[in-house]
Amino acid sequence: MKQLTGAQIRQMFLDFFKEKGHAIEPSASLVPHEDPSLLWINSGVATLKKYFDGRVIPQNPRITNAQKSIRTNDIENVGKTARHHTFFEMLGNFSIGDYFKEEAITWAWEFLTSDKWIGFDKELLSVTIHPEDEEAFTIWHEKIGVPKERIIRLEENFWDIGEGPSGPNTEIFYDRGEAYGNDPSDPELYPGGENERYLEVWNLVFSQFNHNPDGSYTPLPKKNIDTGMGLERMTSIVQNVPTNFDTDLFMPMIGATESISGEKYRSGDAEKDMAFKVIADHIRTVTFAVGDGALPSNEGRGYVLRRLLRRAVRYAKKLNMNRPFMYELVPVVGEVMKDFYPEVLEKKDFIAKVVKNEEERFHETLHDGEAILAEVIAKAKEEKTTVISGVDAFRLYDTYGFPVELTEEYAEEAGMTVDHAGFEAEMEKQRERARAARQDVDSMQVQGGVLGEIKVASEFVGYGTVATESNVVALVKNGEYTDSLQAGEEGQLMLDVTPFYAESGGQIADSGYLLTDGVKVLVKDVQKAPNGQNLHKVVVEEGVLTKDATVKAVIDTKNRSSIVKNHTATHLLHQALKDVLGTHVNQAGSLVTAERLRFDFSHFGQVQADELEKIERIVNEKIWESIDVEISQKAIEEAKEMGAMALFGEKYGDVVRVVQVGDYSLELCGGCHVDNTASIGIFKIVAESGIGAGTRRIEAVTGKAAYELMNDQVSLLKEAAGKMKTNPKDILTRVDGLFAEVKQLQKENESLAAKLSNIEAGNLTDAVVSVDGINVLATKVNVADMNNLRTMMDDLKNKLESAVIVLAAVNDDKVNILAGVTKDLVGQGYHAGKLVKEVASRCGGGGGGRPDMAQAGGKNPAQVDEALAFVQEYVKSVSK
């Protein structure tokens, strides 16, 4: 068997099947752009479904690929077992109605055993087949020459996911030798059993039947081949190492973690080994996922990334790493994978920035969680219980992102346990709340009453017209059918033809009037009815509106004009965000009204002022270029091939509406737009903010609203200049002068504060007491913040030379605590970090730090004196 790297095995596989007439399909993005309902690409065949289901005919029916994949159904097993991963590569060869079993089996054997390729010893290979698959048995035994005793028949060798294509499969196993199992009484020690000796190398699926709705199976007219070989597992066999983690696909990340942590992999500590494995696996997943456009967040694929990073940070604590470090591994992943995935190194700076940002956020959360947990433990001790309630554990998890496993570790240190059943009960309550929230989405109560019974058609013609003659085909009042609405009454109605746009895709509904002889009806809102028609919410202002009446339906054109300006502007904004911030930006929500637009998007940090200026400039330049906006109907596949942006979670039909702004923007959209960007006039960003981790929001105005906003800003500038007794053009110079004056005054104030602190520190030396021969000072002081506490601490250390000091200051019902230990006493075992943690816990807080200096916070000022009294107890305990 050859000595090969993981990269060489990958390339060798693709080269082999290229020689056999296969087209190499590029590895697709982990974010499945062609299937918005799928969270991740999770297999080699996932990106080829369009070929297997007949939607697209491949140019070559023989395909091979090396597909990056993510599976997260068993995250908790990663690191515990030899081969569980969240990110992996699947090597595969596929036949779309071309070759079948004989070629698939023959080529698999050739690749594995030929000296030109992998060069496995044939005697170490065994295969499994379905008991009724005599064709596979004949090929394996008579053509390939595998002895009968190494062909195992297993009932589970049948690939079936319910209705649709299905068929038997054959798996190839490699015998790693007696070192991995030699107990003849082990019932699982056989190819296909649960053991470490016989490892599955390759799975060949023969899709030859259709599983019918009645449970029967009938032969497929065109038979397919779908195979899968896990690169990581194959590499572990070729490199003769005990686990996938010991291959060159993982060891560089493990080695880098060793250097950062100072700990050693495979040092005999199973917990530390698991930590190394978790970190190596999870950084691969996060690196590739972020590179493909996913960002940490609280839902969907972003939540998966957040969970993986937090799990890695938790395990890093076992390696004594309490700072952000995962981001340092990103370029290491890039180097390992650069031969086949050069884009990772190209994007490494961006990916590392995202990872570091998320790590820093979680370390802040951990600190907050530790403080809350200290309160929970103290409360439990007061109540004389040794169990942390499920409610408290869930609050730590849900509010502070505090893993329950970490809560358990702290509880164990305090001689306590966690109520797991209570925790799971709280988790289930949250799931129920989420399920209920998802079901409660019927705006205007359009899902209730008789509306679901209305099947009459209603055609929307509002893209091309603003007024039309229509018939009232359904009239509803208080959830029931009615024949008429009187003046002053409200109701809901449907028209056979309507120019009124129903709220959808972030665009609000049109408003306007229905007019006929002596009747005037205000259309206040329009929503989609249960069966898809436009449902108009109306109030009769004059006359009596009757069912079957013929009316003139007229939208408010001034209102619509403002709406379409803002809607087209969101498309320009979306593309400008991608241009300036990066291709990871994706729409996360929008609101388009007549007054303003709001656009939510994925991004890991605040958008900087200069970036906002660039974004605004780009949008305005596209407006001033007077670009035509073209709208067309396209087949979904054609639209995607054109590069049209689709939204995650949206369901699209076979034919979609494509909105194209020149060669700049291309999106699938059902909304209303301007004919030319010049109609927008001007675009002005009003605000940028964060609305959740990984999601930002931009609010903006266009046209007249933008002009009025800028006019107001100019007026404000003039008013400010007047108050500063200067001209608007000189206001910056005036402000700079004022800042310089303030800075000088602050400097003088700080100097006075330092002198006062020094005087107070001198007075405090009288409060020093001797405890077992150690100078101890534990007292409250009157200072404004932690900086002044540090200054005072430095003065006291210099004056006392040898002492244990704890200072506490109360401001705005909060307690700042600072502990200091002089160098000579640090050497005797006194530790400021441990001391301040204990003191803070006694006044409702937490903290920590170095042996010589540490800080903490507390929430109960009334308990400060009691907390400070503990300092003498601590000194006595150490001096014993």
Swiss-Prot record:
GO terms for cellular component: cytosol. Catalyzes the attachment of alanine to tRNA(Ala) in a two-step reaction: alanine is first activated by ATP to form Ala-AMP and then transferred to the acceptor end of tRNA(Ala). Also edits incorrectly charged Ser-tRNA(Ala) and Gly-tRNA(Ala) via its editing domain. GO terms for biological process: alanyl-tRNA aminoacylation. InterPro entries: aa-tRNA-synth_II/BPL/LPL, Ala-tRNA-lgiase_IIc, Ala-tRNA-ligase_IIc_anticod-bd, Ala-tRNA-synth_IIc_core, Ala-tRNA-synth_IIc_N, Ala-tRNA_ligase, Ala_tRNA_ligase_euk/bac, DHHA1_dom. The keyword Oxidoreductase does not apply. One of its GO terms (molecular function) is transferase activity. Its EC number is 6.1.1.7. It comes from the Bacteria. Zn(2+) binds at residues 567, 571, 669, 673. Pfam families: DHHA1 (PF02272), tRNA-synt_2c (PF01411), tRNA_SAD (PF07973). Its main location: cytoplasm. Its cofactor is Zn(2+). This is Alanine--tRNA ligase. Belongs to the class-II aminoacyl-tRNA synthetase family.
